[in-house]
Amino acid sequence: MKLHTLVLPLVALAPFVALRGGEAPKHVTNSLGMQLVRIEPGTFTMGQDGPPLEDYLGQKRFKELYRATDQIDFDEKPAHRVTITRPFLMGVTEVTVAQYRQFDLTFKASDAKSKPAEDDAASGVTWLKAVEFCEWLSKKEGKTYRLPTEAEWEYACRAGTTTLFNTGDTLPDAQQKWFGDENLRVAYFPPGPMPQEYDWRKAGEKAMAGLKYGELVGGSWTHENARHDAAGSLRVAQKTPNAWGLHDMHGNLAEWCSDWYGPYESGAQTDPLGRVDGDFRVFRGGFHSSLIRFLRSANRGSRVPYDAFDRMGFRVVQGELPKGTLLPKAPPPLNAQNVSQTVPRIVPQPANVPFFAGPKLLVHVADDAVGPVYCSENHCMTITECPNGDLLAAWVSTPAETDLTCSHAASRLRFGAKEWEPASPFYDAADVLDGAPQLWWDGDKTLYHLDNVYYKSGCQSLRHSTDNGATWSKPEFFRAAGDYANQLMRTKDGVLAIPYDLFEVMVSEDGGKSWQQHGRRMRGSEDVRPGNSGSFIAGYHPAMVELADGRWMAFSRLDPVPEQARFENRTPVSYSSDHGKTWQWDMSEFPVVSSAQKSVLLRLKEGPLLFCSFTDQWRDWRNRKGLVFKSTVGDYTGYGLFAAVSYDEGKTWPDRRLITPGGAERKWITKERTPFLISDTLAEPVSYLTATQSRDGNIQLVTSRNHYAFNLAWVKAPAPAPKK
């Protein structure tokens, strides 16, 4: 058969049509009632070379990001010629609920919340289950069913086009449904009707009056309203098909492909099959309630194979897998290259000699970096010492905290080195709204890495490394969608505990082999205030330690002004006597922190507790009040990042010190490249904090950009007299 890249448009749901000369039919209906269309061989350009994503956040233009429909993610490059040598049949639509239930009768049968219709696309299906469905259907019919390769998917989506979408360089009116996340909608779009490509109800002029950018218009959808208006429906084939008769290639649900995710390579390829191995499987097409930039024909995404994210679906291909070539695994990033496996002999520094160093720049990212690490926002740090003496830090790197163009980056401060290495990619699923990663060393041979994602954006995974982070185990399912995890704690009796924001605590009593949920998520009607109790930690972004009497204590951040008033504008503290199942709420002596700030709480090896936080909320920085600190000539008021030490299990905190190198007033940079002044009385005013104590006795504290190292003796010592 002659190779070509274009065929005449067909009606997607047309009855069986036989070709002249006894050729295979263009459309078939299988035993499930599934319509499939024949895709002919051909050659096309896969990927997109530009234009690159701009630094909208750094340029103070974030509210314009939704207009960037043509800007690419780094993993779409280089664009390259691909030849598909064999025809295949592809599902005209995503697999529907009715079709999937012939494989699994129980699929969402008891899901009272979504109540999917039979012609809705089957959502929340893992890659593993999609493959299992294909194997079942293959056995049932005696024909090969499978997921499309990534190249087959993009080839079929484009249907001969070279534009951003198969409909041109934009989508038709109301093509992209939006009913999934009001918080993200108001983060991206100004008040009022959404752009014409989006399908969302319009607000009247009265509803829009007085609203500012980022404020909610019209309230949240209820499920009943959404289905009544068809805006919340996942019904297939409601939009015009592409030129080859395929529906919903842009939006509705994202669709699994067979490939392992990995970077593209340049040069022409024939029947590519992706990488030989990886951590993530590719998905394509984008999903509802996201910016249309993520629906482009070239856009790529990836997830762990066991992720049952509710915006994932799939469509099938009938035909043998192409006899293409698998690419080798991608080379390791800088943070995993040439990692020493020598365990050094580390002698602790004299405990009575004060030591301080910093701030040292941790986040080395080029000013114009737009992938795989980003210049705009580097946030939510985690740090651990490795057995070989290296410090390993990881964090979220993104153009904006709410954007799907989000990655995990990492850097090493190698043992004996003076500077952190340039940031490089860490474990990262593409087009997934990442949350704060967590790293922890068990003190022996094993590093733990807990992957975090935005609440309801997917499952969480756990990995291990026994070679100082040079390689990691395959990710294992840790828990279904939850909110952000915070720093892991190990108790005296070996219990591992991870506190979650406004959620429960995940607890392991067998060294991490199995985990149980203790407590539950906060409910909006509960009266959270000092003196009351509940099944969760008050506030969020909690930092937690075990007390000498076996209780757990957590300090948290708190944002809403009315809730802060209940705690007299002080940091909430919560206590649990039953391993996190119930909590008693109180307030500490320290000022409350809020948006863009996070505290840290550690049990030092010397025995005392260390608490690091900020004297003032970032939103109040212009009217800051500060705290009183000791100097060699008496008390003074300091502002910003501080450390405090307790010798009586958190009852009092007599030793405090502003975390600053002191000296003449000068500029430094913090979170989101925000400048601040540093001096004898001024310290870093805003950031998320995390810390670990290394074997030399030093506290390794990192902010969203910087690294400080100091010891207990330094915190206890009075600061030099501030210069006037």
Where are these regions (language model features)?
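Functional-site microenvironments in short loops/helix caps that host divalent-cation chemistry
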Residues: T45, E54, G58-I72, S110, ...
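Short, structured beta-strand segments at or near domain termini in extracellular proteins/domains
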Residues: F309-K323
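Asp-box/BNR beta-propeller blade signature and adjacent active/binding-site loops
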Residues: P328-K724
